[in-house]
């Protein structure tokens, strides 16, 4: 899928950041619909970081919020994805910015909204394993060249809800 002009669809931006993860308490089964594992940005605003943010600041914010990734934005347009793992692996100084380390929007691991609706949790786990990724951005196509970021699926949250991992994040 050609990914230019990715816009963030978002719900109520004033909702408390940690309130969004209450859905993580519901147990999942491998046969459940994959959409049950998605953080839907129509209901819960995404956690984002500006591309010029310092890596250390982004990592501190991730730790404080209990997350492992942020969408990277410029003027409400998604330009990439930054993960805690990418930050930890980067050679960095206080001057290193997200834009230097992030995965560009065109290279973000993604799944189409329609495909997600037709998938199960088992299918998601196979995608995570096969692609060796920890996050899948959910894209909703508007036209052949334009898509919006509808949500995200986090591997660690799926595993936790499947009771496959004791990892607290």
What are these language model-derived features?
Residues 1-169:
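Tandem CBS (Cystathionine beta-synthase) repeat/Bateman regulatory domains
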């Amino acid at each position: 899928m050609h990914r230019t002009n990715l816009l963030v669809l978002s719900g109520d931006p004033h909702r408390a950041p940690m309130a969004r993860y209450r859905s993580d308490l519901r147990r999942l089964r491998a046969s459940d619909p994959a959409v049950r594992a998605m953080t839907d940005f129509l209901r819960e605003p995404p956690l984002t970081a500006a591309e010029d943010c310092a890596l250390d600041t982004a990592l501190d914010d991730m730790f404080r919020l209990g997350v492992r990734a942020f969408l990277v934005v410029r003027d409400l347009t998604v330009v990439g994805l930054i993960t805690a793992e990418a930050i930890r692996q980067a050679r960095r100084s206080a001057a290193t910015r997200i834009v230097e380390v992030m995965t560009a929007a065109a290279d973000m691991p993604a799944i189409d909204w329609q495909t997600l609706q037709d998938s199960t949790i088992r299918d998601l786990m196979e995608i995570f394993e096969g692609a060796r990724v920890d996050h899948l951005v959910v894209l909703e196509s508007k036209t052949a060249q334009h898509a919006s970021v509808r949500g995200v699926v986090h591997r660690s949250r799926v595993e936790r809800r499947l009771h496959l991992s004791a990892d607290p994040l």
